[in-house]
């Protein structure tokens, strides 16, 4: 299959000892740490926060060493038939049908405005959190701070996300510790990271809040806006079946399945038979769906 949308990043695991270098700090007061003090100073210098305000925040953070253990679990790559069995179950399909029927007016209105199909919006919410039934129960201040300062491998990324989280709490005029999400800091039904929330979340009903936890209009519009701003083309094919003979070069492209660095024309020149209605200029990636063991 040539697929014209990118997939979510899969982060490979690293040896446990790399993440435990800073585990010694868990349990100590965050405000005694030089890196936390440096973060506070930099955040204050950029404006919008006072040092006392941030010291109160870090003084109330509960570090979560179990999050480090979760992040250290070896990553797995599952074939499509296993993913489908686990994530597209009969019960989830029923939940999706109910979610869509209960909210059809607002979802279809969002779809019309953004040009993103209603079924795609519904499917994304279902895969991410099973329609809000699994949004995570960690206080985001706790999870993001733990990862920002006790997970060296991705400290830079999570410090940026922590900074984004602090800003969005101000923007939403909410207590920083009322936000709940996943162990990795993802939020709401669509599981947006704080930076994605600030950039792509939408206040659909104009109530002054971008509530991606409870407000289906905000959820649907945020998903649709994210897709549109990332290049969704209304009416364009998302995936098409192709025929090919595997060569070492094509196998390398299959292995790099999340890299959207080639066009349909590139694949045609490598011998991939793509349906004629797909233009050569379209960016695409080659993806193999294993529908059964060995098939």
Where are these regions (language model features)?
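Short amphipathic alpha-helical surface patches that mediate protein-protein
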Residues: 59-62, 126-129, 243-244
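Acidic/His-rich structured neighborhood in mature extracellular/periplasmic domains
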Residues: 78-222
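Flexible, glycine-rich surface segments
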Residues: 176-294
């Amino acid at each position: 299959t040539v697929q014209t949308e990118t997939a979510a990043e899969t982060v490979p695991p690293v040896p446990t000892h790399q993440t435990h270098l800073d585990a010694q700090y868990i349990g100590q007061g965050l405000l005694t740490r030089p890196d936390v003090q440096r973060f506070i100073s930099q955040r204050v210098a950029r404006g919008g926060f006072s040092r006392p305000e941030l010291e109160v925040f870090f003084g109330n953070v509960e570090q979560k060493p179990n999050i480090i253990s979760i992040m250290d679990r070896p990553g797995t790559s599952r074939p499509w038939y296993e993913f489908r069995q686990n994530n597209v179950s009969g019960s989830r399909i029923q939940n999706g049908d109910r979610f869509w029927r209960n909210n059809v007016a607002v979802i279809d209105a969002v779809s019309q405005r953004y040009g993103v199909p209603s079924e795609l919006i519904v499917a994304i919410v279902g895969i991410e959190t099973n329609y809000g039934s699994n949004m995570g129960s960690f206080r985001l201040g706790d999870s993001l701070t733990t990862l920002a300062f006790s997970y060296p491998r991705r400290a830079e990324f999570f410090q940026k996300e922590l900074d984004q989280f602090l800003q969005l709490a101000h923007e939403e005029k909410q207590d920083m510790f009322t936000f709940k999400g996943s162990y990795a800091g993802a939020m709401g039904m669509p599981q947006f990271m704080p930076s994605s929330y600030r950039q792509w979340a939408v206040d659909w009903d104009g109530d002054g809040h971008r509530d991606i936890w409870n407000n289906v209009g905000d959820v649907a519009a945020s998903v649709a806006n994210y897709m549109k701003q990332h290049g969704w083309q209304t009416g364009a094919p998302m995936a098409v079946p192709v025929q090919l003979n595997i060569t070492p070069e094509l196998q390398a492209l299959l292995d790099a399945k999340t890299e959207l660095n080639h066009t349909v024309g590139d694949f045609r020149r490598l011998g991939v038979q793509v349906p004629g209605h797909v233009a050569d200029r379209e960016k695409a990636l080659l993806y193999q769906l294993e529908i059964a063991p060995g098939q």
